[in-house]
């Protein structure tokens, strides 16, 4: 298949720049790929789509304030670092701007020296490995000095950084939010649980690769970025029991889908406690092994995320749904509206 097969017209004004005042006030497009039906709804009605005995699976990763602005100690030139992943100890892989001035041994100071980054290795595409030195606890220093790494298509300043976290965010490590989860409130989750739906959490730390465009025409040549995931034994046992009793596995977002399908592919459709790195690329032709339904936001044209949704619901039907969303003025991307796919 070709990347252009997943293109669609999207007016720029439909890209949501700020979150709605109420998380669950967003619109919800419910699409049923078997019956080829579409229903316009609101997100708090997702309760109607969930049945007693189902499991709702959410990614509890927490976004780090991973964008740091500092200056080189020798020249005082401005430097921007974006933390991508913790490689070991105080060493991090980062994306640096301007990268060409940051050679091995270069020191960058943040917050009047409260945090120092020393470049230990040069990588391609502006990547660097740096080692941080600081007093106290690294995450506390980062919380005070760092900024939220909002996606490149969001140009408005985020007034409340909690709005780029899910209400159940717990495990530090993401460079971007698992945005399908931003719509849930604690009250809505309580109602879902009261209905007899199991709430299950896994972790996948979202990397910046989630925003990288597909740069090849032939999808078979595209290589996905790797992201760290983890599923506990308790969560795996709960999900297997739900499956065995006839309930559905309903994933919140593409990160939850990719984690579940990675593990299901390893263990013949069964779920087991597991952790590691995944670069699974779910595109049309993929046979789903675990996920029965899911919620997700509206994604970028020609993105791997549109391809994932198309793998589940069919490309033509998904593009039809996207065109409907454009006509009905749904809001797109991270702070936008949602889709429930069954």
UniProtKB/Swiss-Prot annotation:
Pathway: tRNA modification; tRNA-queuosine biosynthesis. Its main location: cytoplasm. GO terms for cellular component: cytoplasm. The keyword Zinc does not apply. It comes from the Bacteria. GO terms for molecular function: S-adenosylmethionine:tRNA ribosyltransferase-isomerase activity. InterPro entries: QueA, QueA_dom1, QueA_dom2, QueA_sf. It is found in: Cytoplasm. Transfers and isomerizes the ribose moiety from AdoMet to the 7-aminomethyl group of 7-deazaguanine (preQ1-tRNA) to give epoxyqueuosine (oQ-tRNA). Belongs to the QueA family. Monomer. This is S-adenosylmethionine:tRNA ribosyltransferase-isomerase. The lineage of its organism: Bacteria, Bacillati, Bacillota, Bacilli, Lactobacillales.
């Amino acid at each position: 298949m070709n990347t252009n097969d997943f293109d669609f017209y999207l007016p720029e004004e439909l890209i949501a720049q700020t979150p709605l005042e109420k998380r669950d006030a967003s619109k919800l497009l419910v699409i049923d790929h078997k019956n080829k039906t579409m229903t316009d709804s609101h997100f708090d009605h997702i309760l109607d789509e969930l049945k007693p005995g189902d499991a709702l699976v959410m990614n509890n990763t927490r976004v780090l304030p991973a964008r740091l602005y500092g200056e080189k100690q020798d020249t005082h030139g401005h430097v921007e670092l974006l933390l991508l992943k913790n490689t070991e100890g105080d060493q991090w892989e980062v994306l640096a701007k301007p990268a060409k001035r940051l050679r091995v041994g270069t020191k960058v100071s943040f917050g009047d020296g409260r945090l120092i980054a020393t470049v230990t290795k040069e990588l391609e595409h502006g990547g660097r490995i740096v080692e941080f030195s600081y007093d106290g606890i690294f995450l506390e220093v980062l919380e005070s000095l760092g900024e939220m790494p909002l996606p490149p298509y969001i140009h408005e300043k985020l007034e409340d950084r909690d709005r780029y976290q899910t209400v159940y965010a717990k495990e530090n490590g993401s460079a971007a939010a698992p945005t399908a989860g931003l719509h849930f409130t604690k009250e809505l989750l309580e109602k879902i649980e009261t209905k007899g739906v199991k709430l299950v959490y896994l972790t996948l730390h979202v990397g910046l690769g989630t925003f990288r465009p597909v740069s090849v025409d032939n999808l078979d040549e595209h290589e996905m970025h790797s992201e760290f995931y983890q599923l506990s034994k308790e969560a795996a046992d709960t999900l297997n029991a739900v499956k065995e009793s006839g309930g559905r596995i309903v994933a919140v977002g593409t990160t939850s889908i990719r984690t579940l399908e990675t593990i299901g592919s390893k263990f013949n459709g069964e779920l087991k406690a597991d952790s590691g790195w995944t670069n699974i690329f779910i595109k049309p032709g993929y046979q789903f092994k675990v996920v029965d339904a899911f919620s997700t936001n509206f994604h970028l044209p020609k993105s791997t995320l549109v391809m994932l949704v198309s793998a589940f619901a069919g490309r033509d039907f998904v593009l039809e749904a996207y065109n409907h969303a454009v006509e009905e003025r749904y809001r797109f991307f991270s702070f936008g509206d949602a889709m429930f796919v069954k």
